[in-house]
Amino acid sequence: MKNEKAVVVFSGGQDSTTCLLWALQQFEEVETVTFHYNQRHQEEIDVAKRIADKLGVKNHLLDMSLLNQLAPNALTRDDIDIEEKEGELPSTFVPGRNLVFLSFASILAYQIGARHIITGVCETDFSGYPDCRDEFVKSCNVTVNLAMEKPFVIHTPLMWLNKAETWKLADELNALDFVKNETLTCYNGIISDGCGECPACKLRKKGYDTYMEMKEAK
């Protein structure tokens, strides 16, 4: 795969940044695509651009604000609380988001001559989001290939990793500190360790602490 081109679906968070670093070791040429869907915080867009610039990677920014009209949710609306209720999808779930993102990433890949598309979705710590499942990604891969008559390959390096294992991968890529300090996972728009209170921050911290304990125990 070293002599091929890839597109990374990129938000500037822990997962997509780890995927970008993985892709840079796997492919000759890598570009990123970031989607603006009226997220609560402009910081996500700024962080994605800053990380891409630091890594010397081209960043495409696409306007997906229509998503907010179709599917109001806690990631885009200040008047919707971020909460998780047992037996229900979290209020941060955006219906169809990954379907739209992967479709548009495939269109971009078509235009720039890339065959590989990388996304940081995973089924292990997926908060119940149905569009983070392996079954969905494989189905989407077949669909975009049929739609464009191209042999795209959608890669999911984190699909079967939990958060601790994702930190381990970042460490193996010699980028543990970079991912910890430069990325934005927090739903409240705070870089690095975040607010420590939202579900994303708690999951990230739990994974980091678990990995560091495993590392120190060796």
Swiss-Prot record:
GO biological process, one term: queuosine biosynthetic process
Pathway: Purine metabolism; 7-cyano-7-deazaguanine biosynthesis
Reaction equation(s) it catalyzes: 7-carboxy-7-deazaguanine + NH4(+) + ATP = 7-cyano-7-deazaguanine + ADP + phosphate + H2O + H(+)
InterPro entries in the cross-refs: QueC, Rossmann-like_a/b/a_fold
Cofactor mode of binding and number, as noted: Binds 1 zinc ion per subunit.
Enzyme Commission identifier(s): 6.3.4.20
Keyword Ligase: yes
Pfam families: QueC
Keyword Aminoacyl-tRNA synthetase carried by entry: no
Residues annotated as binding Zn(2+): 186, 195, 198, 201
Cofactor(s) demanded: Zn(2+)
Residues involved in ATP binding: 10-20
Keywords in alphabetical order: ATP-binding, Ligase, Metal-binding, Nucleotide-binding, Queuosine biosynthesis, Zinc
Coiled-coil region: none
NCBIfam families for the chain: 7-cyano-7-deazaguanine synthase QueC
Assembly description: Homodimer.
Similarity remark: Belongs to the QueC family.
Functional summary from the UniProt entry: Catalyzes the ATP-dependent conversion of 7-carboxy-7-deazaguanine (CDG) to 7-cyano-7-deazaguanine (preQ(0)).
Record's protein name: 7-cyano-7-deazaguanine synthase
